[in-house]
């Protein structure tokens, strides 16, 4: 795949226009070559801008890039949940993946609980692929790539980034590095917990109402951060009406990047910019105005309805 091909595909995807099934296959093949070399805990250099859940809200991702700057000018770290629930999971994920292939050192993608075959069959991505491409091949190519995404990232050895949270099975970074990540998200265990767990105002661990992962308290965060010489845990996974929420004496932050979530929650979104000294700056943004959203593409009516 030539650089000019890739640039054309990126331009098309930025306009919310789909690329062909063959192009998706080639893009995913190239992406796999890059992602397979990345660690379970990917090292990321500052300055970097951290983004939470996007959930197929393509036009709001365009707002995010307006606020945070375009890739590759800005170094980005996305904390997973690129797909499901929104109307444009296909274009959202493929654009982020194309940027990853084009600028591998300027964008890091880690896996969320929705980067899963099972979950996408329920929450929209599967149906969207079928509707837009008329077959499941694109869904298969993309979900195969999900298995190669990193499970976490560490910025300058000091900031631990993960989609969901901590796990009672994980004491150190080496415990994460020991996971065989190239598989469907399991129903329980360390890999599952990283994508499903949530912080809560409790002590220790509790079962999660989500049915997967755990709730974990400030004492757990304190212990993990001390043991691993970490200053901050940065995670996503939970809607925050104000766009971000700091907890546990500034030892953990939730960043949420899908404004007006599901097109009805009325929340703002945020991204977290870290400068080269890891100084934090939260940027708040709102959903893209209606006129920036374009019209949903009308599918031609199949002959048998005419």
From Swiss-Prot:
GO cellular component: cytoplasm; nucleus
Keyword Electron transport listed: no
Keywords: Hydrolase, Manganese, Metal-binding, Protein phosphatase
UniProt keyword Ubl conjugation present: no
One GO term (biological process): double-strand break repair via homologous recombination
Documented EC number(s): 3.1.3.16
Binding locations of Mn(2+) 2: 81, 113, 163, 237
Cofactor: Mn(2+)
Family under the similarity heading: Belongs to the PPP phosphatase family. PP-4 (PP-X) subfamily.
Annotated protein name in UniProt: Serine/threonine-protein phosphatase PP-X homolog 4
Organism: Paramecium tetraurelia
Source species taxonomy: Eukaryota, Sar, Alveolata, Ciliophora, Intramacronucleata
Designated gene of the protein: Ppx4
């Amino acid at each position: 795949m030539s650089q000019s091909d890739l640039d054309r595909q990126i331009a098309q995807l930025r306009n919310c226009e789909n690329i062909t099934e063959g192009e998706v296959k080639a893009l995913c093949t190239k992406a796999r070559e890059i992602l397979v070399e990345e660690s379970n805990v990917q090292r990321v250099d500052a300055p970097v801008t951290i983004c939470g859940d996007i959930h197929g809200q393509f036009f709001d991702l365009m707002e995010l890039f307006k606020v945070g700057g375009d890739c590759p000018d800005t170094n980005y770290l996305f904390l997973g949940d690129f797909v499901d629930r929104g109307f444009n999971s296909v274009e959202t994920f493929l654009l982020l993946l194309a940027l990853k292939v084009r600028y591998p050192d300027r964008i890091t993608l880690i896996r969320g609980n929705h980067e899963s075959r099972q979950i996408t069959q329920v929450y929209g991505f599967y149906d969207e692929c079928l509707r837009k491409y008329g077959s499941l091949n694109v869904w298969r190519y993309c979900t195969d790539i999900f298995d190669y995404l990193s499970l976490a990232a560490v910025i300058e050895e000091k900031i631990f980034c993960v989609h969901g949270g901590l796990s009672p099975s994980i004491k150190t970074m080496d415990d994460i590095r020991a996971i065989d990540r190239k598989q469907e998200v399991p129903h329980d265990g360390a890999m599952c917990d990283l994508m499903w767990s949530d912080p809560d105002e409790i002590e220790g661990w509790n079962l999660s109402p989500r049915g997967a992962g755990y709730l974990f308290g400030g004492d757990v965060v304190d212990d993990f951060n001390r043991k691993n010489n970490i200053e901050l845990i940065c995670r996503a996974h939970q809607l925050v009406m104000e766009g971000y929420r700091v907890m546990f004496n500034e030892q953990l932050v939730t960043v949420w990047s899908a404004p007006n979530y599901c097109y009805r929650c009325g929340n703002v979104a945020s991204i977290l910019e870290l400068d080269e000294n890891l100084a934090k700056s939260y940027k708040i943004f709102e959903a893209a105005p209606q006129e920036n959203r374009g019209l949903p593409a009308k599918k031609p009516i199949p002959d048998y309805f005419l």
